[in-house]
Amino acid sequence: MKYIYLCVFTVCFFSLSIAQQKREVTLTGEVVDMQCYISGAMGKATGPDHKECATNCAKGGIPLGILEEKTGNLVLAGQTKNAMKGANEMLKDFIAEKVTVTGRMVEKGGVKLLLISKVVRAK
């Protein structure tokens, strides 16, 4: 009987894990360069005043992220189509602008990564 309960629990647990991995999310926020924003080395590191610096950082390989409008949380941006380039190529035209992104959210070690499938300028 214990074996049956263990099997049922295991199947349910893995089914929930798989369902969560496939869940798409949509969020709105500003595209920022992760290094300047997190370190605070360049002050606030958001908005049009920081666009040139963030663009240069992204060209230099610093990853971009989304500063979520609702929560103020910072989410690392990634993509699945061309993973070797990260999301910088996809987001470079939107740096320091408000966007709405859709993708699959994954988390490991306290870091959230949004694997972006769609990005549009927010209204």
Task: Describe these PLM feature segments.
Residues 5-15:
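Bacterial N-terminal signal peptides
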Residues 18-123:
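OB-fold and OB-like single-stranded nucleic-acid-recognition modules
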